Amino acid sequence: MTNSDRKEKLPGYFDSAWPVECGGNRRQKAATGKLLSKNSKTEMISTVSNKWNVMVIQREKNEFFLGGTMPYFNGPKPYGWVQKINSDSLEVLNESPQLPCGDHVWCGAIAAHENGSIIKVNGSFMHVLSPECEVIL
């Protein structure tokens, strides 16, 4: 039987509720806790960025990172990016520079490493960023 990724810390990842896209490598898309929305008022916040927003991950409590890419069909070469966002307002707090993809259009992957850095994969490139979205490697 397959273990549930939400019941134990995922080795290699930052110890948070959602350190990697889809909740883990097995893509179980499940987190611990409750939504507690039964008696709550529904509120939806949205924003338009004109980017291919792919996945949000959590590092520390209330510290969220959005990763994505720019699709390329004709025009400028594609690139990836990471934004540190405010989860209440969706305001961008920090943003990486354009991250090369190697001319390969793929939505990419994002994870919070156990050492605290953010790992972003785009096309044939892997980038390591600080929690302030600065490129380390």
Protein language model regions, located:
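Beta-strand-rich domains and repeat architectures in extracellular enzymes and scaffolds
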Residues: 4-81, 101-108
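Structural signature of WD-repeat beta-propellers
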Residues: 77, 121-123, 130
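A generic structural motif
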Residues: 98-99, 125
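Conserved beta-strand element within WD40/beta-propeller blades
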Residues: 66, 119-121
